[in-house]
A protein has these predicted regions:
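Short, hydrophobic beta-strand segments
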Residues: 7-13, 102-123
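Short aromatic-acidic-glycine turn motif
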Residues: 41-45, 83-99
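Edge beta-strands of extracellular beta-sandwich domains
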Residues: 27-39, 136-145
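Long hydrophobic segments that form regular secondary structure
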Residues: 1-31, 66
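Exposed beta-strand face motif in extracellular beta-rich ectodomains
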Residues: 14-18, 59, 125-127
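Low-complexity, Pro/Ser/Thr- and charge-rich linker/hinge segments at domain boundaries
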Residues: 35-56, 146
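Beta-strand-rich structural segments
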Residues: 21-22, 56-74, 80, 129-130
Length: 146
């Protein structure tokens, strides 16, 4: 194998867990990556980057299609509509390099099962984001500090 930092191998598909571990020349572990098969159930999961946000500051909320254990379902795709109470939606989108919607829209298509909402916290005690794609919905509340 050439020393170009790329290892490539084929593995037959089988549900479960696949773990890759890299080692240096002395046998010390350098890194580890795990892929786990998602379950049948699908839901939208909303996870804020931090547990609290200061009034007037930005809160980043990751929206994902997951199974009941929180495993991301990258092949699930949908248009997620976001509503915010106690704050202002300042951006909504995904990491797709050819994203065609405005980031100021309240609806975003998911990319590999994910989207990101950016909310500016208001002056109240908390902000609540509700995400709905017509089949699944979720809400998350983030306490606002002053």
């Amino acid at each position: 194998m050439k020393n170009d930092c790329l290892a490539k191998f084929s593995v037959p598909y089988e549900p479960g867990r696949l773990e890759a571990v890299s080692y240096d020349a002395q046998g010390c572990e350098l890194g580890r990556c795990t892929l786990t098969t998602a379950g049948q159930q699908t839901q939208i999961t909303a996870g804020p980057e931090q547990n609290t946000v200061q009034a007037g500051h930005l809160c980043y909320i990751r929206l994902r299609y997951t199974d009941e254990k929180g495993i991301t379902k990258p092949l699930a795709r949908g248009n997620i509509k976001v509503e915010v109470d106690g704050g202002t939606l300042v951006g909504l989108g995904n990491a797709c390099p050819y994203h065609e919607r405005s980031y100021l829209d309240c609806v975003a298509d998911t990319y590999y099962g994910e989207a990101l909402a950016i909310v500016r916290a208001g002056e109240g005690d908390g902000l609540t984001l509700t995400a709905d794609d017509g089949m699944y919905s979720t809400a998350v509340t983030v306490p606002v500090t002053h």
